[in-house]
Amino acid sequence: YKDAPYHGMGEVQVYPMATDIVCFSEYIKSYKCWADIETVLRTNNIPYQLLPETKDLWARDFMPIQRPDGTFVNYIYNPDYLQKYQDWITSDVRKCFDFTSKKITDLDIVMDGGNVIMAGEKVIMTDKVLSENKDKSEEKIRRAIEQALGCELVIIPWDKGEKYGHADGMVRYVEPNHVLINYYSDIDEPLREKILKALK
């Protein structure tokens, strides 16, 4: 939703200021919080849509990434943490949303939408993307992502205390050349230093 605050739970988009609708997995209807969320959306005239044919709540992780120009980038969603739960993997996003009027490009890289932080002319991801694409060199992965998303890839170290390897739990884009990061000083100062070094 254009100019709305970022809503992380179950959204399609990753670049919130360039979007005009908030999308949720249809699974959200089974949660008690949905009534309150829907009330807020309707009260504020925020357009929203429930996505059918999803296999898990976290639409942000498997739905295509929206670029600032309104086009979409689809990727291979097959994370290591769901290998024992294949029934939870939404692999055909075209069943969830009508992309016929949208340009959608397929990216031959295994990744999660939760590991993608669009930050102006840059995209921030953890190095989990490298471990999930061991058949490709870092250079090839970097080139493919940068070409598809149209911006420079910044790779930060993965916080191994979090099995998903998602950058969205570590950093938040605020404005050009400014991000917020988790307060790692008390729990992992070496990781904090590595993150700051990667972001500079």
Regions from the PLM with identified roles:
Residues 2-200:
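The feature marks the mature, well-folded catalytic cores of soluble enzymes
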